[in-house]
């Protein structure tokens, strides 16, 4: 009797496993499956080549596992000795060109800035294009820090990190892994991908979640089989199939996207991001952290901010704003946030007798 039960159980489990494999293959190989495109009419953007004098910015590159990463190094005027440096990159799908408003402000405050594009995005190399994969982006941040420390113009013991949204989580994880980081500024950071996904499910519904899962599975399995990637929009109107399905997100990117921003990403990131929980690393951070959070952030529940504050303890400086996720990039909210960041970096990157 026991033997029969074991055999039947094994057959049932094998059947379930086979059905799952068949489902994945069908999802991956079924022809003519695509996500509706979201054509983004971009604003005028930032005329970077005109606004930034060549003597204030250098084009530099460094490599990660044989792939060249494109970066810009900004140095403060009148530099006579190694200076502190801020290492930074954008959030979900953003490029270094879109961070110019922050970079020039930090540079004017006397700091060097190394801003880079992740592999597969912007002006960096790597195939497939538009691959957003969290472990790779964390490697890129670590490599950028190492490169900054190797520069003769930079004080290797005064390297800080800046991140926003998805990269706001990256800089916290990077600081948890690298005890030499001097300080971290994380703006509207992704702290808990699972909590953010649950909030997204509540806002957009189960149909959206199931459609997103199907597209993510298709791309992931196709990558295992060596097939071309399956892509979905990064940003779309509320209710559309996009990684950021939100009218405010759409309006922000329409206003601010750079000419090298491409509104699509390999769909597999949707299966990677919900497991990403930087909040679980915060107990390992041993440097000052500025957390600027938005009370109406679609990706950051207030309970997660409270958890982050508890785990960071005395290292945390938390500033909450009664605004949405994308408001912090605009107008007076941007000015308030960036001025606080300059104050924070100046305090922790400059010795009291050096500025």
What positions do the PLM features span?
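N-terminal cap/lid segment of alpha/beta-hydrolase-fold proteins
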Residues: 39-81, 330-331
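The serine-hydrolase catalytic nucleophile loop
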Residues: 91-105, 118, 303
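Catalytic nucleophile-loop/oxyanion-hole region of alpha/beta-hydrolase
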Residues: 95-96, 121-156, 160, 331-337
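Conserved alpha/beta-hydrolase
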Residues: 103-126
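Short beta-strand/loop motif that positions the catalytic acidic residue
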Residues: 285, 291-293
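Conserved alpha/beta-hydrolase "acid-adjacent" motif
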Residues: 298-304
């Amino acid at each position: 009797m026991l033997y029969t039960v074991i055999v039947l159980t094994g057959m049932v489990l094998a059947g379930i496993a086979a059905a799952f494999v068949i489902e994945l293959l069908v999802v991956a190989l079924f022809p003519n499956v695509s996500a509706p495109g979201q054509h983004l009419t971009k604003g005028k953007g930032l005329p970077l080549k005109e606004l930034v004098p060549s003597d204030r910015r250098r084009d530099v590159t460094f490599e990660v596992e044989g792939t060249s990463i494109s970066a810009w190094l900004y140095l403060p005027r009148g530099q006579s000795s190694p200076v502190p440096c801020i290492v930074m990159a954008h959030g979900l799908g953003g490029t270094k060109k879109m961070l110019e408003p922050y970079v020039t402000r930090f540079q004017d405050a006397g700091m060097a800035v190394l801003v880079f594009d992740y592999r597969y995005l912007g002006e960096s190399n790597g195939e497939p294009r538009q691959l957003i994969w969290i472990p790779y982006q964390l490697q890129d941040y670590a490599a950028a820090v190492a490169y900054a420390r190797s520069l003769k113009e930079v004080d290797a013991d005064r390297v800080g990190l800046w991140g926003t949204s998805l990269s706001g989580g990256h800089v916290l994880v990077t600081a948890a892994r690298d005890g030499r980081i001097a300080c971290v500024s994380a703006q509207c950071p992704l702290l808990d991908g699972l909590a953010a996904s649950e909030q997204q499910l509540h806002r957009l519904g189960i149909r959206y979640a199931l459609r997103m899962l199907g597209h993510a599975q298709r791309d992931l399995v196709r990558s295992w089989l060596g097939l071309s990637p399956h892509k979905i929009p990064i940003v779309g109107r509320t209710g559309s199939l996009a990684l950021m399905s939100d009218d405010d997100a759409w309006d922000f990117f329409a206003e601010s996207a750079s000419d090298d921003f491409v509104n699509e990403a390999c769909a597999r990131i949707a299966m990677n991001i919900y497991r990403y929980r930087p909040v679980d690393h915060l107990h390992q951070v041993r440097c000052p952290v500025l957390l600027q959070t938005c009370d109406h952030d679609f990706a950051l529940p207030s309970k997660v901010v409270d958890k982050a504050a508890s785990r960071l303890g005395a290292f945390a400086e938390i500033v909450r704003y009664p605004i949405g996720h994308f408001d912090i990039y605009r107008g007076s909210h941007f000015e308030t946030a960036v001025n606080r960041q300059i104050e924070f970096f100046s305090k922790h990157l400059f010795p009291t007798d050096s500025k």
